[in-house]
């Protein structure tokens, strides 16, 4: 499984590594294009790799789900990302996702990774619950009595100073 961010250079691509920021993603909606890959033969059928995406506050992740992949090629450009490889059976997998493209329908091989999904609106409610929890803790910890007068401390220190000076 490969997880690729959409603002990294090919020099930064490593198996299982992720980079990217949502503001760099620039996707209106993902689109797919099944253009013929230059090295593909007519005898072998090409398929799309199952692709998952999810986002975080600073990153957008794309995972191309392929086990035992070989001949992995990733092309990242300003307007698209192209992923191709061969699986263990020798079947060529090819995905091309263009950015800023208008999409009429969602490709069947692209789906949301709900295991990593976060509801950003729900996070605000959760943070508010944490703030309320801390406010309750502070109420429990705070004392409702007035602080001690400490008049005795001043008297003792003065008498101790007087005794040493005599």
Swiss-Prot record:
Domain CS stretches: 46-154
Origin: domain of life: Eukaryota
Bias type Acidic residues, positions: 151-166
Transmembrane segments: none
Gene Ontology cellular component list: cytosol; nucleus
Record protein name field: Putative protein PTGES3L
Gene Ontology terms, MF aspect: Hsp90 protein binding; protein-folding chaperone binding
Family: Belongs to the p23/wos2 family.
Chain's gene name: PTGES3L
Single GO biological process annotation from the record: chaperone-mediated protein complex assembly
Disordered as annotated region, ranges: 142-166
């Amino acid at each position: 499984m490969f997880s690729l961010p959409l603002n990294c250079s090919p020099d930064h691509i490593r198996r299982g590594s992720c980079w990217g920021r949502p503001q760099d993603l620039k996707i209106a909606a993902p689109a797919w294009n099944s253009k013929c890959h230059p090295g593909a033969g007519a005898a072998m059928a090409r398929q799309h790799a199952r692709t998952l995406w999810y986002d975080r506050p600073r990153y957008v992740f794309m995972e191309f789900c392929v086990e035992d992949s070989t001949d992995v090629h990733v092309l990242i450009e300003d307007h698209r990302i192209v992923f191709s490889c061969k699986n263990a059976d020798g079947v060529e997998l090819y995905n091309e996702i263009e950015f800023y493209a208008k999409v009429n329908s969602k490709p069947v091989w692209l789906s949301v990774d709900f295991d990593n999904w976060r509801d950003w609106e729900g996070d605000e409610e959760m943070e508010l619950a944490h703030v309320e929890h801390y406010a309750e803790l502070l109420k429990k910890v705070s004392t409702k009595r007035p602080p001690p007068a400490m008049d005795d401390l001043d008297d003792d220190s003065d008498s101790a100073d007087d005794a040493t000076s005599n």
